[in-house]
Regions:
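Divalent metal-binding acidic/histidine catalytic loops
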Residues: 1-152
């Protein structure tokens, strides 16, 4: 069962990176137990696979027709957030951001800080800085392809 566990988690890593960002947290938690998974971890991984099976037809639709875009924010916009000391093992904070283009997510990130922040404000500042760096990248991208979208 350990070999099955490892190969299944490895396969899910591919899905997370390319098609299923909604599995990122679950897969990252399972990666922590790759060397010695217990029955609890195997049962949990089977629940993830059932979730994957039941949500196989769920996806993102990128439709830029005028009829659908009337009810959707246009251009590039993003959000960020941080959770101060939310990891009970390390007391590290989680930072996250997501950027949308024409209503569809095009870039996202969620990760534990590499260091311990001293306050909620510090955690939020770090998340804002990370999101601003990503917004700058998108600005350069749109400038390079000859169009201009403002990040909101």
């Amino acid at each position: 069962e350990q070999r099955w566990y490892r190969s299944t988690v490895a396969s899910l890593i591919y899905f997370v990176g390319w098609t299923r960002p909604d599995l990122a947290l679950a897969v990252s938690q399972h990666c922590k137990f790759m060397h010695n998974p217990g029955q609890v971890h195997i049962a949990s991984l089977k629940r993830v696979l059932r979730y994957l099976k039941h949500t196989a037809n769920v996806g993102l639709k990128y439709d830029f027709s005028p009829a659908t875009s009337a009810s959707v924010k246009t251009g590039l916009y993003g959000y960020y957030d941080a959770a101060h000391a939310d990891c009970p093992d390390s007391m590290k904070s989680t930072l996250a951001y997501v950027f949308f283009f024409e209503g569809c997510p095009v870039s996202w990130h969620s990760k534990l800080h590499t260091y311990i922040t001293t306050s909620t404000n510090h955690s939020e500042y770090c998340a804002a800085a990370k999101a601003a760096k990503e917004a700058k990248w998108w600005e350069k991208f749109f400038t390079e392809i000859g169009t201009r979208y403002f990040c909101r």
